[in-house]
Amino acid sequence: MDKQRGTFSEVSLAQDPKRQQRKPKGNKSSISGTEQEIFQVELNLQNPSLNHQGIDKIYNCQGLLPPPEKLTAEVLGIICVVLMATVLKTIVLIPFLEQNNSSPNTGTQKARHCGHCPEEWITYSNSCYYIGKERRTWEESLLACTSKNSGLLSIDNEEEMKFLATISPSSWIGVFRNSSHHPWVTINGLAFKHEIIDSDHAELNCAVLQVKGLKSAQCGSSIIYHCKHKLYR
């Protein structure tokens, strides 16, 4: 009977070898790196429809780097953002530089609105005056002042006329008439109220400011011109 029990015990141990290889409770089992890779391959074979998002999660869980395709897409995205920012900066910057490098005429207009006369102009009362040195016909003088964003010299009152007469002995003013039978008018089409020493000569249809007053002259004569514009305060 004792022999049978001994034989039975040996057979039981032989059939259940795990009991002979029990590990202490304090040690934890771990899966090697090779086993993890095998697990991943088996997972991919079993689930071929896994998308990139699922694969990324697996990589993140294991502390591995993302696939190179994802890194390439991120780099291309950053490059696109930088290029777009550069293009937008250029679009905004170019008009700004063109505005700063605008023509002197634009500078003259700004000076008028800022309440200051441009350089080489003089200020009297509430107006700016350009004292020209070139001799031109009446029509040429009118065009020259227009190019300076101003008008050919005009006279508002007697005091201004006396002041201007001291600056130049003779200069065109923005007053004319169609013929000796027509009244004197300004370039704005308004009737001119100041007296002009007239002549019966049919060709003297433009007005000139002299030291002694206003006088009619031939419009084709070459005379010094002055320009004027109002200050906007």
Curated annotation (Swiss-Prot):
This is NKG2-C type II integral membrane protein. The gene is KLRC2. GO terms for molecular function: activating MHC class Ib receptor activity; carbohydrate binding; transmembrane signaling receptor activity. It is found in: Cell membrane. Changing residue 60 to D: In allele NKG2-C*I01. Residues 1-70 are cytoplasmic. Natural killer cells. Heterodimer with KLRD1; disulfide-linked. KLRD1-KLRC2 receptor complex interacts with TYROBP homodimer; this interaction is necessary for the expression on the cell surface. Disulfide bonds join 117-128, 145-227, 206-219. It comes from the Eukaryota. Its main location: membrane. Residues 1-32 are annotated as: Disordered.
